[in-house]
Amino acid sequence: NDVMLIVEQAQDWWWFWGNDELDETTNIHSFDIAEGGQTTYAGSGRINGTVLDQFCLSEFEGEIRVASTTGQWNRWWMADPEPMENHVYILEQTQDSAGNNTLEEVGHLGGIAQNERIWSARFVGEMAYIVTFEQIDPLWVIDLSNSSTPTILGELEVPGVSTYIHPLGGGHLLTIGIGPSNADGTGLDWSKTQLSLFNASNATDPTLESVIGLSPVIDTDDGWSWGYSEATYEHKAFQYWEADGLLAIPMSIQGYYSDTKEIDGRLYYASGYEYISKLMLINAK
């Protein structure tokens, strides 16, 4: 609560056009907000790759931890772009020879999940939890207790992908995301919202304790339905009451229906759309 981090792309969006040698980098600026009504600049640093969201950032005991993705997957004109891979950087505030405040890299773990990108991340104390995805979702459990040598302790592959990670304590994680599209657990079906409960208390052997799918919700034999939850991309729509172990998330369902009826020997056909908003309550102890 005493540190504010601001992240920006180090280059304008067009900077790499026509130059395949340059890679994306990210600037990180740290500010001390411990004193009420006052903000003090603490230092800046730069890492390789791009940062997904605020949960890929963390400050813990004076160190800045960042999860990023590198690669040239968005350069469609290249015949052989660099593959994606993921990283965890640990930065520490220091001063350079000119006396300027900087954030210096003191630890780095690279090569995580080649050809995949980060879909969600969460730093909890001396641990980091990262979800990557290509065809199936690996959950990575990373030990940050030694800043100079962050280490992968465990990995678990599960169907679908988690887009938000909510720590429950004791190494348990409650996640929301997208369910798989294929029977073998691969791919993504964007009409399926999926909740998962992980147990990573044994960091070297994380397990999936429970999973539940929430959509589509409309059951119909003469049409189709499609549903999603805003909580899959907006964490403020994910509300968890720890005392009762109760999760509340919104659901939006869209359905198409059609029907044919015979009245006085004539056939009448009707079709249309239904839009339903629901608040889903889930026992997630």
Residue ranges and their predicted role:
Residues N1-K285:
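Feature marking well-ordered beta-strand scaffolds used for ligand recognition
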